[in-house]
Amino acid sequence: MEIEICCGSIQSAANAKAAGAKRIELCQNLNEGGTTPSYATVKQCVEELHLDVFVLVRPRPGNFVYNELEIRTMEEDVRICKQLGVAGIVVGFLHEDGSIDTALTRRFTELAAPVPVTFHRAFDRCKDWKKSLEEVIACGCKRILTSGCQPTAMEGKETLKELVQLAGDRITILAGSGVRPDNVRELVTYTGVREVHGSCKVQTKGGYDETCAEKVVALLKNASTITR
């Protein structure tokens, strides 16, 4: 069972590391769905914390339809993140009608190679998830981060289960959104996912969210006891 902790700052990443996490998705502005983190933060996570860092490449909040200026920025982000030694790139592209932008998705998997690409929760906004699954696979992505097209993974567990069955060994279904220590066993057992994604966040006295080491410890512990 692989666990990915979503971290929105260098301190959150350090907390996840201290709790035993090996892999993180790194972003900033988590409350807005996440945007691309600073290069310094990426560098610290890779070189000082020695984590497997999957970097979210998203230039702004909002929809997943980008203009050429934004796309060029994202391409440069990917190039720099590869130079910094990241373990994965996380992106997602849609057309206005909610279909997968396959041309852009393929363009970014080729640019990122040999670094693997995760297609993020833009997938949950697609209009036809079965068709979209096949398109994302054909574009060369290695993972799909999804809640089963529902607000949380538990609410989307029926779709997640079907996604796992349809995907087989062709792509990894990474279940995320609302994954907690108290529901991870039920989610994994029911859906058959082999990887889960959780933020394990709490609000600090400073009024911002941060990854909670105790929650990460509990999530890792409960996930480690799952038997198939």
Model-derived regions, located:
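Hydrophobic, well-structured mid-protein blocks that either form specific transmembrane helices
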Residues: 82-134, 139
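Alpha-helix-loop-beta-strand connector modules within alpha/beta enzyme cores
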Residues: 34-61, 100-122, 155-181, 213-228
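Active-site-proximal loop/turn and secondary-structure-junction residues that shape catalytic pockets
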Residues: 9, 30, 59-61, 95, ...
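Active-site beta->alpha loop and helix N-cap motifs at the rims of alpha/beta catalytic domains
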Residues: 10-12, 35, 42-102
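Acidic (Asp/Glu)-rich catalytic clusters
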Residues: 17-18, 42-54, 79-85, 107-112, ...
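Catalytic cores of alpha/beta
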Residues: 8-15, 65-77, 124-139, 163-167, ...
